[in-house]
From Swiss-Prot:
A molecular-function term among this protein's GO annotations: UFM1 ligase activity
Protein name, per record: E3 UFM1-protein ligase 1 homolog
GO BP, one annotated term: protein K69-linked ufmylation
Region of interest: Disordered: 404-483
Keywords: Transferase, Ubl conjugation pathway
EC number: 2.3.2.-
One CC-aspect GO term: endoplasmic reticulum membrane
Similarity-based family: Belongs to the UFL1 family.
Entry annotated with the keyword Transferase: yes
Organism: Drosophila willistoni (Fruit fly)
Function as written in the Swiss-Prot or TrEMBL entry: E3 UFM1-protein ligase that mediates ufmylation of target proteins.
Endpoints of the signal sequence: none
Amino acid sequence: MGSDWDEIKRLAADFQKAQLTSTLQQLSERNCVEIVALLLEKQLLDVVFTNDGKEYITPDHLEREIQDELYTNGGRANLVEVSKTLNVDLSRIETLAERIAEENPQIHLILGQLIDEDYISHIAQEINEKLALRGEISISDLASQFDLPSDFLQHQVVEKHLGKTIKGRQDSTNPRVFFTQAYIQRCKAKIRGALNAITRPTNVATILQQINVQEKIFHSLLDEISPAGQVTSKLSNAQYVPHIYAKTQSEWVQSFFKQNGFIEYEAINKLGISDPKSYILKQLPQEELYFLKRIALQQRLVDLTVVTALNECNATKQYLDLSTILPSNLSVEDIEEVFHTLTSGPKQSHLSTLVYLDGIVFSQPYLNELIQPCQELALSQGKSAIDSGIYQQYIVDKTLAQKGGNASNQLDDDEDGKPDKRDERRKKAASGKAGGGAQGRETKTKSTKKHQRGRAAAAQHSDDDDDDFQRGGGGGGSNKKSVKPLDLVKCEDVVKLIFPVLEEEGIEHLAKPIAKLYLQQLNQSALAKAQELYEATPQTNRRQTHASIQERINTLLVDIRLYEKGLKLLPQDTQAQLVKYLLKSLGNEICNELALYVASECNLTVKNNNLNVDQRNKLAQECDAQYRAVLVEQNKALNKSIDDFELATESVLKVCSMIIKKVDKKKDRLLIADHKQKLQQQLLENQEPALILHLAALILFTSISGCILHASGKFVSSILQYIRGSLDDQQNALLISYHDLVLKVLQASPESAESKLAHEQLQGLQSKVVELAQNFSRASVSKAD
């Protein structure tokens, strides 16, 4: 080992000698590289190579060069830039920079940068200048300006030099904000001046916008200023309420309440107070109040005025307008709430009989006297309901609806019980025949006027439902249907009776509310009267219904017999069509009359009085056994001959205990003459060409044949053909021409020239056709004899 060291010393001496000698005696570059490599290999030398490997330097010298770079850059050097400048690897620079920062407390390594105290003092001076200029500064602004960490700036720069280089103070609520004392004084002066100038509640945001002060400084300085007012909160929507405004609010509320005895919540809301009830309690602690929906009302005012007046009204037959004794500012809703608040209290329970309507209170005796005439109306309406049969139908519907709710699991029991009920009805029917043949309750029927001599209108009630009737009593599984209440007394009738009395008092606008108030009571009185009359005269009404139906059926049968006599004069093929038309019209009407009568006898309710064949067959299946077969057979006879239909009808009448009147030929002639007269009257009243031709043909047929005919418009040609031989050529030509023009009008377009021309020609012939039908005499016709 010693020999090696001696050899090294010798080489070093040679190296030094070579450097001091002339060029011819220096070592070559290769020898130098070998010598350095050997020293590095023996770890006797520590050097740092440059990035290109052509140069090397010792760590100590590199450290001095880094410090020189730090000084050259003004106390702040980026290690990346130093690495580029010294041409040394960045890792070696970072390692040495860390050692420099550890060994020298005046130098800091921050985010890849070396910073010394001189630079920190320099930026502290800059911060002080900026703070003096702006009055307030934050660490975040400094961090973005100097590109340094905020914690380093706060602790190593600002706080370290605060009060020395940096003349200012730190915000106690936000340590990252610093400001000068002069700035604080300016802000205080601005805030104090703004708050002193405000006379009404103002948003803090508006104040800050005007004085250009930050919100956090405003709230931190507010307690130091101690303004004559208060801030509602520290939120963004906070308001400043000056003391003078709060005092004015309090004085206004107390003054208004003292003068009026009440105060509206809306008025307090307009003052900027969000909880009016709490504010009223705070401002009027000694007052006893009624807190209503819209107002607070003084209890003493109500006791002295309203309660006294209500007691007086209750004791007399009078009414009281509350709006005349309560403050005029109160609405109708407020007055109603006051009344209900008073009458619902236990102390004023004796006032519960009073009736309130639209601001006016009525005593019960006053209303009883007012409504007394309506009681007579109710009794009259009850009697009318019995006379018209409305109440009887209502009783039937109500009974069926109550029975129709039986459960489907009781179907067998109901079916087993039906024969007993039917036997009972048969017994009642047997007893009823002695008194005229009526068996069931009365139901509304059509008028007894004859067809084409004033037929009744269609039935009053109709329903689109296929099930137009409902079995009363034991229909198992049927749904329970509610019956609409029967209103015998109408609101309009009650108003008409009480209106004159109320009009004299100037309160006629309450006529309808009072009528609605007593309408149910009056209807109950009317129903009670109807029930009384119904129970008193059931048999009489049933006999009248039975007789009415019997007369109606006989009238229709006479019509059919007379029409049959007339249609037999026409050709055989036309006769068949006319028979079918006759049965579909008058025959169908007879079937309906009898089906409805039987339905009432069997306690069935029928919603639609205008029944078709299927509905009548379905209804027949619901009837008692004694009616079922004859009704079905009568329905089938509508598609047969007139004789078959008459026989089937006689069977139904026999079961219903009705009789058919004998033929009276003298009366037949009167009926034919009456029928012709009515046709002539209709002819004079009509202006429709087709109807005029139809009526004229029927009148001429009756005049010529002495018979009446039931035919629709499509049979006009056949009728004209029949009467042709009884007319002269001119009369035939007139009717044929009029007939052709009618066909032309019906076939042509209404707006066409052809149609208009035909109309004009018809107008010219109309009077002649009417005159022919009116004045034609059978005596002048040889064929008629």
